[in-house]
């Protein structure tokens, strides 16, 4: 039947970046997104969801860059904000769907710098999230602002959703999600929050 709200926008779900395509543990997100487009998904969406996380890499960095900042998660395009967006854009163009904008529905940079445990000790990234030790709170702020600048420069990028505001209210330091939060455990504002608060539109 007809849609309940013809003005509602339909945004495709964003595949998680994997960098793995072994057919058992994961399907590479680029392969999956390409298959979505090959199946005709572009005909039914107003925007394509994408999760261009930068891990600990600056938003302008690329996997092909020989000088890496991050000590890990730096050997595949899926670890780079700009590479992920460029790869998804290329897939849209190749599918003849270049009019479909990319919507970064989740992105950000995590760091445990400035986060304290209940005992007042510096929190450290949990196992598997050691890359967050490569960024401090100021880099989190600078990278976030630059990512928004890039999104505005690229006319094929739609609305961008930064993740997350305050998982620190729900989770403890044993969870990697709190590293992305713009608020600390005591609700004080991290530099990224303040930078966005005072950013020119």
Regions found by a protein language model. Give the residues of each.
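Aromatic-rich peripheral "rim/lid" segments of glycoside hydrolase catalytic domains that contact
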Residues: 118-201
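Noncatalytic carbohydrate-binding groove/subsite architecture in carbohydrate-active enzymes
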Residues: 1-134
């Amino acid at each position: 039947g007809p849609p309940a709200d013809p003005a509602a926008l339909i945004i495709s779900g964003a595949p998680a970046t994997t960098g793995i395509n072994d057919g058992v543990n994961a399907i590479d997100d680029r392969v999956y997104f390409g298959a979505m487009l090959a199946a005709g998904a572009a005909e039914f969406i107003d925007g394509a969801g994408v999760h261009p996380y930068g891990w600990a890499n600056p938003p302008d960095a690329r996997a092909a860059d020989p000088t890496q900042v991050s000590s890990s998660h730096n050997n595949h395009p899926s670890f780079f904000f700009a590479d992920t967006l460029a790869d998804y854009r290329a897939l849209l163009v190749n599918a003849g769907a270049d009019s479909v904008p990319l919507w970064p529905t989740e992105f950000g940079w995590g760091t445990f710098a400035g986060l304290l445990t209940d005992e007042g000790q510096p929190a450290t990234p949990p196992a598997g999230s050691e890359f967050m030790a490569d960024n401090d709170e100021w880099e989190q702020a600078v990278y976030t602002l630059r990512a928004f600048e890039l999104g505005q420069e690229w006319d094929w990028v739609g609305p961008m959703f930064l993740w997350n505001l305050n998982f620190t209210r729900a989770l403890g330091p044993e969870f990697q999600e709190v590293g992305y939060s713009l608020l600390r455990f005591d609700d004080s504002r991290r530099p990224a929050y303040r930078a966005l608060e005072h950013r020119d539109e």
